[in-house]
Amino acid sequence: MAPHALPAAPGNGAGPAEVEAFAPALDESDLAVQVSEHLDDVATGISLAEAKVVVSGGRGVGSADGFGILEELAGLLDAAVGCSRVVTSAGWRPHTDQVGQTGTKVSPDLYIACGISGATQHIAGCKGAKKILAINSDAEAPILASADYAVIGDLTEIVPAITAELRKGREP
C-alpha cells in the first residue's frame, strides 16, 4: 500500500500510540541487503507527500534551469516542487521529486501542474489533490481532463505573472 493512497482513518479516541524501543540482535548473515555507501540526505524543502501545495513541472518546462520559476512560485506558496517522470528521466530533477505511479503519490489542497501533459501514470500520483490547476500550451493536453482550473498558454509567461501578483498581494 502506497502512502497517502487512502484518506486517513479517524482516530479511536484512545490518544497517542505508545512508542516502544526495539533493537533486534542481528549479524550480517541475517541481512538480505548490505549497505555499501551512505549518501547525505539530499532532500530539501517541503516533503511532497506532506505538502499542502505542490508546484510540479513536466517536459514543457524545457530544462533543469526552467524549474527556477517554479521554485520561486513554490517559495511564495510554501509549496513543494514536484515533477513528471520525463523530467527525472532527463536528469533535470531527482527521482525524489517525481509525482506519479512510480514516484510519490500526493494529496495536497492545490496541485499546480506546469507543462505536464498528463500521462495516466502521472495522474495516478496527483489525483488525490483537492484542486488541480493546469498550466499548459496544449489545449488538448490530457491533464486538462483532470484539472479543476486550466490556463492555456506559455508557462514561462504565466508562472512569473502569478508570482508577481502574489508578491503584490504581500506588499505592505
Regions found by a protein language model. Give the residues of each.
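N-terminal glycine-rich FAD/FM-binding segment characteristic of electron-transfer flavoproteins
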Residues: 1-172
